[in-house]
Amino acid sequence: MLTIVQEALTFDDVLLLPAYSTVLPKDVSLKTRLTRGIYLNIPLVSAAMDTVTESRMAIAMAQNGGIGILHKNMDIAAQAAEVRRVKKFEAGMVKDPITVSPETTVRELIAITSANNISGVPVVKDSKVVGIVTGRDTRFETNLEQPVSNIMTGQDRLVTVREGESKENIQALLQKHRIEKVLVVGESNELKGLITVTDFRKAESYPNSCKDDLGRLRVGAAVGTGADTPSRVEALVEAGVDVIVVDTAHGHSAGVIERVRWVKQNFPQVQVIGGNIATGDAALALLDAGADAVKVGIGPGSICTTRIVAGIGMPQISAIDSVASALKDQIPLIADGGIPFSGDMAKAIGAGASTIMVGSLLAGTEEAPGEVEFFQGRYYKAYRGMGSLGAMAGRTGSADRYFQDSKAGAEKLVPEGIEGRVPYKGPMGNIVHQMMGGLRSSMGYTGSAVIEDLRQNAKFVKITSAGMSESHVHDVTITKEAPNYRVG
């Protein structure tokens, strides 16, 4: 018997109604919850795709106030290294800096600094700071077998600060002594941390950046349900990851639910997101397993073919509403996929999402992985679904997401995505600016001062295809493309 559960709607089927407003777009707050314990300064998350998010994109996302989720289509060590790159890129204070002893040779020091991409190393003896050695000390040194004690800045010239010193005083000290690094010490001259002028400059350049309690940029990472997942999670947690995303095509499955439960039981300090799902029942199952947020979206992405190949899914607006209605604000939900315009972000939030995950919007940007290609007079970058043959073949991370065996050979894989190219878009910051500007406009139209106002108070109208045609540009030839509007 044919059972029709409900009529389902997506972004082009609805419009938000304007409301009385005293709110100006420039005055709204875009701060929102990613999970139970993590807040973002903008409601934007970059997708865990191998043509969208690696460390460079994750750094840029966090600097702009969002967060990037590192894809898992790489081995464990490589993914953990990507996490470390993000966490080490900026730090209010490096809590556990790499150190050397006075007896360490210059050759050994150079090897350490090269391997860890650092330029200044504290010199410690019996847990006490005795000096610091920087790139200036080693740059023209020819005797590589001598100890660093011969070339370091010793205690008599060493500039240090006590733990808890104000940012203003530290900046004044750096400027007064014309130095780029200062050591933080305790009452007995024991090393507490390292502060660099570079981190101050980064913080000033990106005042809206999303950081943890130690002043480091936040980053997430995707894992699956395969046999190597426990080792992968352990390595990611050790590297300092802020959030683990148990990322599969079908989040309402026993393996995903048990993996979410396992991560929360073994690493309770780490936030866990489960997905992808499209129903309220799935959301409640993941909530019961301990998920700190859920990810909603089966098949809405521009490169996803799940709805056609498997005949499975739910139009995204209805999926978001179904999950939000079931969760009743106990944990946040992330709307994942099908977002070509900033107005769709506003619709997703109005339907119940707290954050938006995007892939195609950020694919083709300078920060996205991959080389720029020249084709028929235009520049492009590759973009593919994680369910495409290219992503799954020979890479266990992506095949695992779709519950398939990459070792079976490409001819045995059943793809649920395609491979393609998108125009090169330049720096991602320009796109984020336009998308968040559109969201601000929507909040102004609806009288929403904060994201939660839009989530709770939005009202929709259902429209026809004629209504959507009327909404788009019509009866005119575009002569100059707008930065936030592209059709086709």
UniProtKB/Swiss-Prot annotation:
Organism in which the protein naturally occurs: Acinetobacter calcoaceticus
Its Enzyme Commission number(s) read: 1.1.1.205
Going by the entry's taxonomy, the superkingdom of the source organism is recorded as Bacteria
The Swiss-Prot or TrEMBL record lists the needed cofactor(s) as: K(+)
Q: Which residues of this UniProt protein bind K(+)?
A: G299, G301, C304, E470, S471, H472
Q: Among its keywords, does the record have Oxidoreductase?
A: yes
- What name is this protein filed under? Inosine-5'-monophosphate dehydrogenase
What reaction does this catalyse?
Answer: IMP + NAD(+) + H2O = XMP + NADH + H(+)
One Pfam match, given by its short name, reads CBS
Q: Which UniProt keywords apply?
A: CBS domain, GMP biosynthesis, Metal-binding, NAD, Oxidoreductase, Potassium, Purine biosynthesis, Repeat
Per UniProt, NAD(+) binds at: D247, G297, I298, G299
